[in-house]
Design a protein with these regions (language model features):
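N-terminal leader/signal peptides at the extreme start of proteins
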Residues: 1-29
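Generic N-terminal simple sequence motifs
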Residues: 3, 12-15, 44, 124, ...
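Residue-level signal for well-ordered alpha-helical scaffold segments within enzymatic catalytic domains
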Residues: 4, 37, 44, 48-52, ...
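General helical secondary-structure elements
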Residues: 6-11, 19-20, 52-55, 63, ...
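N-terminal cationic amphipathic segment used for targeting or macromolecule association
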Residues: 7, 16, 35-42, 47-51, ...
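Generic alpha-helix initiation/capping and coil-helix boundary signal
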Residues: 19, 30, 36, 46, ...
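Amphipathic alpha-helical segments typified by the pilin-like N-terminal helix
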Residues: 24-64
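Short, well-structured segments within or immediately adjacent to enzyme catalytic domains
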Residues: 60-275
């Protein structure tokens, strides 16, 4: 018998590595904490920049809104005997000074200019930082808007007494630098432009308490549009307080929500009567 020899085949048996030599596939607690800390640092660096960019975008939109309002008024006036849309109540009272509401006649007129008053987030009648406006009040009826509007005031209260005074509201008599609308909130003492104690239901807002003193630092500024149709950002340092004075020296209407000491009030009242 012939012997048959088979070649020996040496096979290599793979053996699992020892546990202490295995590849690591997880972070240690220290490494995880380091990663979290890095993410937190990056977030702290990026979030303020993102917030600033968002605020800048809102300011730009607000500026565009006010510019549209100014252009719309300049379109309205030439077709209406050079008068701007009135900022007063629909009842025709000669003393009422309402700038934050639009009555049905004004709503119809602005709609014809493409400035539709509606309760939606893209409304041209409010700042993007006040998305709740405009608000419709069916009991009056009127729309509360998000801007202060100063155009077309046919009468105002005189600083030396509670009686009507003529107002140069024609566009041709106005200076281009006069503020037409502004992104601000005014302060009242329970009435809109009338002295305390007035009981007219169409003037008093019974559910509106007197505003308290402003807390914290003053704002950086605000957007304003002007009679010439332009609009720009105005730093707070360049603003001044617009106040309606009663005959007894009390304030009725405040442009900036800050309670001033009596000495300052007296000086401002004197300056108000001696421009």
């Amino acid at each position: 018998m012939q012997n048959t020899f088979s070649p020996l085949v040496r096979t290599r048996i793979s053996r699992p590595n020892a546990p202490w030599k295995s590849r690591r596939c997880a972070f240690t607690l220290i490494e995880l904490l380091v990663v979290i800390a890095i993410i937190a640092i990056l977030a702290a660096m990026l979030l303020p920049a993102l917030a600033a960019a968002k605020e800048k975008a809102k300011r730009t939109q607000c500026l565009n809104n006010l510019r549209q309002l100014a252009i719309g008024q300049n379109t309205y006036a030439p077709d209406n005997s050079d008068y701007l849309l009135p900022a007063r109540d629909g009842g025709g009272s000669p003393d009422v000074f309402v700038q934050v509401c639009l009555n049905p006649p004004e709503v119809s007129a602005t709609a014809a200019l493409g400035l539709v008053v509606s309760s939606n987030a893209a409304s041209v009648w409010t700042c993007p930082n006040r998305p709740g406006f405009p608000i419709f009040e069916p009991s009056y009826p009127q729309w509360d808007i998000g801007y202060q509007y100063f155009g077309g005031i046919t009468n105002w209260l005189n600083e030396v007494g509670n009686f009507a005074a003529n107002s140069p509201v024609r566009l041709g008599r106005s200076k281009g630098s006069w503020t037409l609308a502004a992104d601000c909130v005014c302060k009242i003492d329970g009435t809109w432009g009338l002295p305390q104690g007035t009981t007219r239901d169409d003037v008093i807002y019974s559910n509106t308490p007197q505003h308290g003193s402003k807390q914290g630092s003053p704002p950086q500024g605000g957007n304003q549009s002007f009679v010439d149709g332009s609009a720009r950002w105005v730093p707070f340092q360049q603003m001044y307080r617009l106040t309606t004075w009663n005959a007894d020296g009390s304030r009725i209407y405040y442009m900036y929500q800050e309670d001033l000491p009596p000495a300052v009030n007296n000086v401002l009242q004197y300056l108000h009567g001696h421009p």
